[in-house]
Amino acid sequence: MAGQKIRVKLKAFDHRLIDQSTYEIVATAKRTGATVSGPIPLPTKKEIYTVLRSPHVNKKSREQFELKTHKRLIDILDTNEDTVEALMKLQLPAGVSVDIKS
């Protein structure tokens, strides 16, 4: 298990939650003696939805909504069993999606 690389991808709609989560992951990994590369901010995906304001007429009157997905990438190098165990016990906010690949 020693010397293995772990890649952590985070996704969230709120940039404050994702920044807080990346800080916690980096601090936990450094505390256990692993080398951390990142967090690397990946491009933000922006989805725009346009809907009619009225249910029947007035095609010219529309409203736009947007949904931004923020992403971060963290590479954890030189891991050991303590690092993996500490990352598994880490409690992150509910609005953050975490993908871990080794």
From Swiss-Prot:
<keyword id="KW-0689">Ribosomal protein</keyword>
<comment type="function">
    <text>Involved in the binding of tRNA to the ribosomes.</text>
</comment>
<protein>
    <recommendedName>
        <fullName>Small ribosomal subunit protein uS10</fullName>
    </recommendedName>
</protein>
<dbReference type="GO" id="GO:1990904">
    <property type="term" value="C:ribonucleoprotein complex"/>
</dbReference>
<comment type="similarity">
    <text>Belongs to the universal ribosomal protein uS10 family.</text>
</comment>
<dbReference type="Pfam" id="PF00338">
    <property type="entry name" value="Ribosomal_S10"/>
</dbReference>
<keyword id="KW-0687">Ribonucleoprotein</keyword>
<dbReference type="InterPro" id="IPR018268">
    <property type="entry name" value="Ribosomal_uS10_CS"/>
</dbReference>
<dbReference type="InterPro" id="IPR036838">
    <property type="entry name" value="Ribosomal_uS10_dom_sf"/>
</dbReference>
<dbReference type="GO" id="GO:0005840">
    <property type="term" value="C:ribosome"/>
</dbReference>
<dbReference type="InterPro" id="IPR001848">
    <property type="entry name" value="Ribosomal_uS10"/>
</dbReference>
<dbReference type="GO" id="GO:0006412">
    <property type="term" value="P:translation"/>
</dbReference>
<dbReference type="GO" id="GO:0000049">
    <property type="term" value="F:tRNA binding"/>
</dbReference>
<comment type="subunit">
    <text>Part of the 30S ribosomal subunit.</text>
</comment>
<dbReference type="GO" id="GO:0003735">
    <property type="term" value="F:structural constituent of ribosome"/>
</dbReference>
<dbReference type="InterPro" id="IPR027486">
    <property type="entry name" value="Ribosomal_uS10_dom"/>
</dbReference>
